């Protein structure tokens, strides 16, 4: 781990530390553009040497209707808390809303790198590694959602 820490983004460390020194509640940052994605990856060191420490899923989108069930993705939320040891043991909280598809592997809590991008339908895709295909992506943890927000909590 010491080697990975020496490679981390020093500017990201300073920015994060400054925000905690100033105190107060840190608001969630929305991902709305590729610049927002770049900012997220820079400030969180691409979650390098991260460990998923908590997963919360809230589904208020299933309703019973005559003959079955109705699902509303707009009423779903997934919150991941990831301890990132490459940036002074910070906890990054990522909140996804309006989930279309997601999978968090219970035997893959380690994160070496992440990919975040907008797909052809302008949905946010978050993956726990850098995959080259949808089939490879489904071997790990991933989220496809309409929105993504993040903050550093600890």
PLM segments and residue spans:
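Short hydrophobic alpha-helical segments enriched in small aliphatic residues
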Residues: 4, 10-12, 21
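N-terminal compositionally biased or targeting/leader segments
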Residues: 14-16
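Surface-exposed, interaction-prone regions used to assemble/regulate multi-protein complexes
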Residues: 18-154
